[in-house]
Amino acid sequence: MRIKNKIKKRIIELIELAYITARKGDLELAREYIKLAEMYSRKGRVKIPLKYKRMFCRKCYTPLITGVTERRRIRSKILIRTCLICNWQRRYVLSRNKGSNKEN
């Protein structure tokens, strides 16, 4: 179990490093970091946490930075995220907060 925790920690470090590198402008190096993180995930059979999985394009492995490599649109309670490099789209249903309708 200890090895899987080390692998997961390294995956998170690589994805965060890729995000920082992409912000500085080196998209190719950022893609390599994410590909390496994906490889670690597959070889070690460790799931990438959802927060980090949504930080990159699953088709071209580019870190998704709003306004730089990603476009976000909201249409009728659906968030559409589009990668500006490969035009890959992902849709997420926007839901209300679970406690927002409760009367106090």
Swiss-Prot record:
It is found in: Cytoplasm. One of its GO terms (biological process) is tRNA 5'-leader removal. Zn(2+) binds at C57, C60, C83, C86. The keyword Signal does not apply. It catalyses: Endonucleolytic cleavage of RNA, removing 5'-extranucleotides from tRNA precursor. It comes from the Archaea. It is an enzyme of class 3 (hydrolase). Binds 1 zinc ion per subunit. Keywords: Cytoplasm, Endonuclease, Hydrolase, Metal-binding, Nuclease, tRNA processing, Zinc. GO terms for molecular function: ribonuclease P activity; zinc ion binding. GO terms for cellular component: cytoplasm; ribonuclease P complex. Its cofactor is Zn(2+). Its EC number is 3.1.26.5. Consists of a catalytic RNA component and at least 4-5 protein subunits. Part of ribonuclease P, a protein complex that generates mature tRNA molecules by cleaving their 5'-ends. Belongs to the eukaryotic/archaeal RNase P protein component 4 family. This is Ribonuclease P protein component 4. It comes from Saccharolobus islandicus (strain M.14.25 / Kamchatka #1). The gene is rnp4.
